[in-house]
Amino acid sequence: MKRVAFVFSSAPHGSAAGREGLDALLATSALTDDIGVFFVGDGVFQLLPEQRPGAVLARDYIATFKLLSLYDIDQCWLCADSARERGLDPATPWVVDVECLAPDALRARLHEFDVILRF
């Protein structure tokens, strides 16, 4: 089976990309066990706790990220530099357990996957 990576690089609630990526991620988990999830660039905002999407009339899909472990999706990485560039501490209590990596280490992990889907 091919190894599939999901890369979240867009901010939540401004577009449907994050929600669609999460839906695709959960659907793919029924087909393969070898899934990696990466949060880079503005995608690090996907994992911030205590978001209030209702204020912009958006659906709260962020809570669904907490279900990843129920789908046996436990390979999750976050770009530490992306977090810092956006004024976030990589040690933030994210909504998902992620391993914070430097860009080079993150890139090396990403190259281990056969298919890369970006949202």
Curated annotation (Swiss-Prot):
Tell me, in one coarse class, where this protein mainly resides. Answer: cytoplasm
Any GO BP: tRNA processing
Q: What keywords tag this UniProt record?
A: Cytoplasm, tRNA processing
Superkingdom of origin: Bacteria
**Where in or outside the cell is it found?**
Cytoplasm
Name any GO cellular component annotation: cytoplasm
Which SUPFAM superfamilies does the UniProt record give? DsrEFH-like
Query: Would the keyword Transferase be found if you checked this record's keyword annotation?
Result: no
> Which InterPro entries does the UniProt record give?
DsrEFH-like, Sulphur_relay_DsrE/F-like, Sulphur_relay_TusC, Sulphur_relay_TusC/DsrF
> What does the protein in this record do?
Part of a sulfur-relay system required for 2-thiolation of 5-methylaminomethyl-2-thiouridine (mnm(5)s(2)U) at tRNA wobble positions.
Give the family this protein belongs to, as stated in its UniProt record: Belongs to the DsrF/TusC family.
Which NCBIfam families does this one have?
A: PRK00211.1, sulf_tusC_dsrF
User: What interactions and quaternary structure are annotated?
Assistant: Heterohexamer, formed by a dimer of trimers. The hexameric TusBCD complex contains 2 copies each of TusB, TusC and TusD. The TusBCD complex interacts with TusE.
Protein name (Swiss-Prot/TrEMBL): Protein TusC
